[in-house]
A protein has these predicted regions:
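Class I SAM-dependent methyltransferase SAM/SAH-binding core
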Residues: 83-135
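Core SAM-dependent methyltransferase catalytic element
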Residues: 216-232
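Conserved class I S-adenosyl-L-methionine
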Residues: 2-73
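Conserved Class I S-adenosyl-L-methionine
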Residues: 188-210
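A short glycine-rich, Lys/Arg-flanked "PGG" loop and its adjoining helix->strand segment in the class I
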Residues: 159-171
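Conserved beta-strand signature within the Rossmann-like core of class I S-adenosyl-L-methionine
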Residues: 172-180
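A short acidic, Gly/Pro-enriched loop at the edge of an enzyme's catalytic core
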Residues: 134-146
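Residues lining the SAM
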Residues: 148-150, 178
């Protein structure tokens, strides 16, 4: 289904948009391991094409992520400690900075992406690690908010990583996940699993749902979904 949709988009859109969509699709191809994904992103960043391919006319995930945080933190944004998971080249960090957030760390497994993010001077600490079931070099209850925009997909962040997100977030803090809506059905890792685990964690008193919102044109013409949870 995802491959057919990608082919249809590529064939029916202008060459530049089709090329960008194709590059993004190759980062989410079925069967990719997390190591494959990290290597692809590093090469994409090194080519100088990543930020052009996923500019604001094509990819709005960072704007949606920053706005979701801005709606929750109306005051004293400079002191809100945030971890941008799957930070990439710093798109979300830049959008958060525009909203007045100043205490932002980033995490991404692709060093080529982080090399670009580092130059933007919107992050404090940058950590080159995969987000998985492995314990990160981050203490419990470190962040007021952890946020992901674009880090969910084939070979990307697994469901089990939700536990680690909760561990590093302070009680009362937020976990915000912004992703393509169709991945809930098209990505085997998430199909009949991700939202079930989210509900199980709520039933177990680990967090509580604040909102679940569908948004248009998250990535190219695809809808996005924003999950917002409060850690207990």
């Amino acid at each position: 289904m995802a491959e057919e949709k990608a082919l249809d988009f590529i064939q029916s859109n202008p060459t530049q948009d089709a090329s960008a969509y194709s590059a993004n699709y190759r980062a989410h191809k079925e069967g990719m391991t997390k190591e494959d994904v990290a290597e692809y992103y590093s090469k994409w960043a090194d080519s100088g094409k990543y930020e052009e391919d996923l500019g604001p006319d094509r990819y709005n995930g960072p704007k949606y992520g920053a706005e979701a945080l801005a709606q929750s933190y109306l005051d004293d944004r400079e002191s809100i400690k945030i971890l941008d998971i799957a930070a990439g080249t710093g798109f979300l960090g830049e959008e958060l900075h525009k909203k007045g957030f100043r205490t932002i760390d980033g995490l991404d497994p692709a060093e080529g992406m982080l090399a670009i993010a580092r130059k933007k001077n919107v992050y404090g600490r940058l950590v080159c690690e995969f987000m998985s079931d492995k314990r990160l070099p981050i203490e419990n209850d470190t962040y007021d908010c952890v946020v992901i925009a674009g880090g969910m997909g084939e070979g990307h962040i697994p469901c089990v990583a939700l536990h680690e997100m909760i561990r590093i977030t302070k009680p009362g803090g937020l976990v915000v996940i912004v992703m393509r809506e169709e991945y809930l059905d098209h990505v085997e890792e998430y199909k009949d699993r991700l939202e079930i685990l989210m509900q199980e964690l709520e039933d177990d008193g680990k967090w509580e749902s604040i909102s679940r919102v569908i948004v248009p044109k998250y990535s190219f013409d695809n809808n996005g979904i924003i999950f917002k949870y409060k850690v207990c």
